[in-house]
Amino acid sequence: MRKAKPKKRQILSDAVFGSQRVTKFVNHLMYDGKKSMAFNIFYSALEKVRAKLSDEQKSSLEIWEHALNNITPLVEVKSRRVGGATFQVPTEIYPERKETISMKNMIFFARKRDGKSMADKLSAEIVDAFNSQGGAYKKKEDMRKMAEANRAFAYFRF
């Protein structure tokens, strides 16, 4: 029997927007416990997004949330070993995991970009995700295509 699951920790909302989602994103962005630096990077990235997309009617937080929703995957493939063969079985993703995957993908592909500061890279990735482009969006589409290709094995889900 497995151990009991640990309790979920309460995540405090951030000071500027009052959003727990922002705090989760910043926690993923943070290195070495430097949360204030991560918040500064995030807020300056949102300011740069606001400058780049000045013709949009939405606020910078709404643009970021829309970009995050654009790169949120719906299905993923998991390896299942059945009868000596390994199958890529498409499975739906739980809502919390969807959010975590999209945040981590956005940060990962922002870090891989060329640019001077992390705020520049993150703002460029947010703009690309908002426009359904960029590395994080491509990753989501690749996951969807792989699940689509392997949907014949969906009955192996347990």
Curated annotation (Swiss-Prot):
Part of the 30S ribosomal subunit. Contacts proteins S9 and S11. One of its GO terms (molecular function) is structural constituent of ribosome. Disulfide bonds: none annotated. NCBIfam families: rpsG_bact (TIGR01029). Belongs to the universal ribosomal protein uS7 family. The keyword Lyase does not apply. It comes from Azobacteroides pseudotrichonymphae genomovar. CFP2. One of the primary rRNA binding proteins, it binds directly to 16S rRNA where it nucleates assembly of the head domain of the 30S subunit. Is located at the subunit interface close to the decoding center, probably blocks exit of the E-site tRNA. One of its GO terms (biological process) is translation. The keyword Manganese does not apply. This is Small ribosomal subunit protein uS7. It comes from the Bacteria. Keywords: Ribonucleoprotein, Ribosomal protein, RNA-binding, rRNA-binding, tRNA-binding.
